[in-house]
Each structure stands twice: as structure tokens, then as C-alpha cells.
């Protein structure tokens, strides 16, 4: 593989096509539009279908329908569109439809600042639709991650028959890095067939609580059985985390904030303060065991986030040591500022 300068959103397009994606429905929205543009240009060249829908509600509906018909389907959006997709995501979860939803986060709420980054949709990604349901959320922190986590998103979607959200942000989506990636068209080999796909026989698919045959029911025992089955699927899910550095101060970070944490850990090391980073490549199901294990050896756990403090609540829930959340909005803070905050806690 040769080195090339490529944008994060462009890497996501290549990852999707190389993962076998053959259907994309979406509505352009900053800062995710490059994904739609790339899929519109490239997907038909590989026998796929691109449809620009009238809005994000139609987009998620089309993607779920295509998935039920056997397509490898994906959509992409940002905050306002992500909000419109929430009912559809719940429908995808209860019907066990393998779809991939890209959210390149921007500053909110409402229209917010379309060109400013944010990590404010982290909890919406996990809990945005009503009711109880499991979902997988991946969080790329680099252009390389944008490629490989997109590929992984499709593999997870089909392995667990579930919607998967790739939660990026404006920084990662629009940055350019020199990386070595597989060439466009080098299709990944994996099982691209949902376990409950229609196969020559009549099958019911409904958003109502249903039996194993897909028939609607109001029986509370069947309701509990359905929910427990949906969650039990993920007993075999292995959270994707990476630790680097040394024991001491532990940064727990995801997405573009991981880049801030990495630079800050380096500055602390230069000052003689041991520090390490636990990079969360999968946010949900939350990697409780990994966070608990690494935090036991930490003097202080620091969770930097480009929001008012969302994932830090999950970290606090499983940690027994001191946890410091650091919030910032619309942009990353300088590593020197984060180091100053950390030193004030030591």
C-alpha cells in the first residue's frame, strides 16, 4: 500500500465500498456531505445504488428497506439529520436490520454551528430512540480510523444483525492525513447476509413487539423475551480499546479528543509525570471492564470531551478512583491548557 494524502470523509467512502456497501441513501448536510458526494460518484462504478432522498427520515427508512431486501446499506448525516433518524434507528434495532449510520458531529443543539466540531451527540447515539435497545457506536480518531472502523462497522452490523453508528466529528471528517490504505475496490471478505433475512418464504417484519416469527404480540412475557434476546446478542461483543503510555494519569478519550489526550500525555511525560491513554474506539456497548481495569492503576482519570460531559458519566459509573471531566465547546483546547488542568488536580 502506498502513502496518500486523503480526507477523513473520503476514507470513510473507501472503507464503505471496500466493505461491500452497495446501497446509500442520504441527504447532504455539513460536515458529512463529502461522504454523500463520494458515494454518488463512486458507488455506481461498483454496481451500487446511490439515492439522494428528500430528508433524513426518508434516508434511514430507505436504508432499512434496502437492508431487508439483502443490500449492504449505509447512510450519513450530522446532528439535525441524526435527530430525525432516531425513530428509524429504533426500528432498525427491533427488526435487527444490519445498517450503518455515519454521524459526523457538529456544534448544536438545533442548527448550531454547521462548520464547528462537537462531540455532543455521544449520548444521543446510545439512547436517542425511545425504549430499551442495544446499539453499537464506534468512534474514529484519525483518517486511518475512518477507513478501518467503517469496514468494521459493516462486519459488526452483519455479525450481530444490528444497526451500527460510526460517530465521527468535523475535525476527523475534514482533516487530511498521509496514510497507507487498501486501494478502492479491494473488497473485504465476510458474511454479508443478515441471519433473519427473508429466504424464499413469507416473513413478517414489524416495529411492534413481536414473537420469534415476527408476529405482533402484547404478551408481556414475549416482550421481556424479545428484549433479553436483543441484549444477549452482544454478550460476545468485544469492545475495541487501545492503551498506550504508562501508568499514572489516565486519559480516557475518544474521537478527536483522543488526539488532544495523546499530545497532553506527551507533554506530561516531558515534565516527569507518567501518563497513559485509553483510546475508546467503540463507545457502546460501553467498555466497562477495560475502563475499570486500567483505572485501578491510575492516580487520576481524566476524560476530555468536546461537550458538557457525557461519556465521563459512564467512566465515573465504573471507576473507583478520582475522575476529572474536562469540557470544551466548538474546538479542541490546546494540550498545554489540558496539562495545566491536570497539574491542578495532582
UniProtKB/Swiss-Prot annotation:
GO terms for biological process: organic acid metabolic process; sulfur compound biosynthetic process. Its EC number is 1.2.7.3. GO terms for molecular function: 2-oxoglutarate synthase activity. The keyword Oxidoreductase applies. It holds the Pfam family PFOR_II. It catalyses: 2 oxidized [2Fe-2S]-[ferredoxin] + 2-oxoglutarate + CoA = succinyl-CoA + 2 reduced [2Fe-2S]-[ferredoxin] + CO2 + H(+). Keywords: Oxidoreductase. Gene3D superfamilies: 3.40.50.920, 3.40.50.970. PANTHER family: SUBUNIT OF PYRUVATE:FLAVODOXIN OXIDOREDUCTASE, SUBUNIT OF PYRUVATE:FLAVODOXIN OXIDOREDUCTASE-RELATED. Heterotetramer of the KorA, KorB, KorC and KorD subunits. This is 2-oxoglutarate synthase subunit KorA. The lineage of its organism: Archaea, Methanobacteriati, Methanobacteriota, Archaeoglobi, Archaeoglobales.
Amino acid at each position: 500500500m502506498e502513502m496518500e494524502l486523503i480526507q477523513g470523509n473520503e476514507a470513510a467512502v473507501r472503507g464503505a465500498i471496500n466493505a461491500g456497501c452497495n446501497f446509500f441513501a442520504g441527504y447532504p448536510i455539513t460536515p458529512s456531505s463529502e461522504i454523500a458526494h463520494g458515494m454518488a460518484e463512486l458507488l455506481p462504478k461498483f454496481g451500487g445504488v446511490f439515492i439522494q432522498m428528500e430528508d433524513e427520515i426518508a434516508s434511514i427508512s430507505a436504508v432499512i428497506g434496502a437492508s431487508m431486501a439483502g443490500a449492504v446499506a449505509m447512510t450519513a448525516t450530522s446532528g439535525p439529520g441524526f435527530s430525525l433518524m432516531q425513530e428509524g434507528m429504533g426500528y432498525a434495532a427491533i427488526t435487527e436490520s444490519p445498517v450503518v449510520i455515519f454521524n459526523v458531529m457538529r456544534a448544536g443543539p438545533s442548527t448550531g454551528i454547521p462548520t464547528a466540531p462537537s462531540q455532543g451527540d455521544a449520548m444521543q447515539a446510545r439512547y436517542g430512540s425511545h425504549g430499551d435497545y442495544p446499539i453499537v457506536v464506534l468512534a474514529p480518531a484519525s483518517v486511518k480510523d475512518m477507513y478501518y472502523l467503517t469496514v468494521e462497522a459493516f462486519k459488526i452490523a452483519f455479525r450481530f444483525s444490528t444497526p451500527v453508528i460510526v460517530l465521527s466529528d468535523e475535525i476527523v471528517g475534514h482533516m487530511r492525513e498521509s496514510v497507507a490504505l487498501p486501494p478502492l475496490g479491494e473488497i473485504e471478505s465476510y458474511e454479508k447476509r443478515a441471519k433473519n433475512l427473508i429466504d424464499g418464504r413469507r416473513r413478517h417484519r414489524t416495529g411492534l413487539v413481536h414473537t420469534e416469527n415476527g408476529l405482533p404480540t402484547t404478551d408481556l412475557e414475549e416482550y421481556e423475551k424479545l428484549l433479553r434476546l436483543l441484549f444477549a446478542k452482544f454478550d460476545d461483543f468485544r469492545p475495541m480499546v487501545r492503551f498506550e503510555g504508562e501508568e499514572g494519569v489516565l486519559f480516557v478519550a475518544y474521537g478527536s479528543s483522543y488526539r488532544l489526550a495523546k499530545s497532553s500525555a506527551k507533554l506530561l511525560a516531558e515534565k516527569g509525570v507518567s501518563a497513559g491513554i485509553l483510546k475508546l474506539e467503540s463507545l457502546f456497548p460501553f467498555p466497562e471492564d477495560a475502563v475499570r481495569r486500567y483505572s485501578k492503576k491510575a492516580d487520576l482519570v481524566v476524560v476530555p470531551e468536546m461537550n458538557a460531559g457525557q461519556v465521563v458519566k459512564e467512566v465515573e459509573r465504573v471507576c473507583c478512583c478520582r475522575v476529572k471531566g474536562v469540557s470544551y465547546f466548538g474546538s479542541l483546547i490546546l494540550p498545554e491548557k489540558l496539562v495545566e488542568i491536570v497539574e491542578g488536580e495532582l
